[in-house]
Amino acid sequence: MEAGVERKIMIDLENSALQFATRAHGEQKRKYDGRPYIVHPIAVAEIVRSVPHTPEMIAAALLHDTVEDTDATLLEIKEAFGPKVATLVAWLTDISTPFHGNRQVRKELDRQHLASAPAAAKTVKLADLIDNAIAIKAGDPNFWKVFGAEMKRLLEVLGDGDETLLAKARALAPE
């Protein structure tokens, strides 16, 4: 495929993912600063863009919270963006529900799920952790104690992700 055509396909995929995520998240706001929620997926995508990536990883970064936090489904994502993007989003979506138990139990289930994820999904998750860590540290120091401990445990299973992002995430995590 010609480089120009490939670039256009990549841009179309990213623009479509951004539009889908913006619609899906609608009026949602970030808990820690009240900004429109879409700023988080955009930040995650930009962090992923800073390291070796594929167009599907950027799309998944933009869509990573849609199944978890909106009415969007994996089937809709698969139909709109293809199986590669949908598979990445599936890996990035928490599998636990309140039915599974308290937060500690749920986060452990989600950690085990991510442990088996491909490197591309782990790279997007590292970007997600980095953006969330920065926001939570600044906006909710009390919750940072909980999130920071969870982040530290999660980093144990994300070693196959991008090494630059892994180092950044480790630097943000509590000692």
UniProtKB/Swiss-Prot annotation:
UniProt keyword Cell membrane, yes or no: yes
MF-aspect GO terms: guanosine-3',5'-bis(diphosphate) 3'-diphosphatase activity
Coiled coil, from the record: none
HD domain span: 37-133
Coarse class of the protein's main subcellular location: membrane
GO cellular component, one term: plasma membrane
Alphabetized InterPro entries for the sequence: HD/PDEase_dom, HD_domain, MESH1
Keywords, alphabetical: Cell membrane, Membrane
One Pfam family from the record: HD_4
NADP found in the keyword field: no
PANTHER family recorded: GUANOSINE-3',5'-BIS(DIPHOSPHATE) 3'-PYROPHOSPHOHYDROLASE MESH1
Name the record gives this protein: Uncharacterized 19.2 kDa protein in cobO 3'region
Source species: Sinorhizobium sp
Top-level taxonomy: Bacteria, Pseudomonadati, Pseudomonadota, Alphaproteobacteria, Hyphomicrobiales
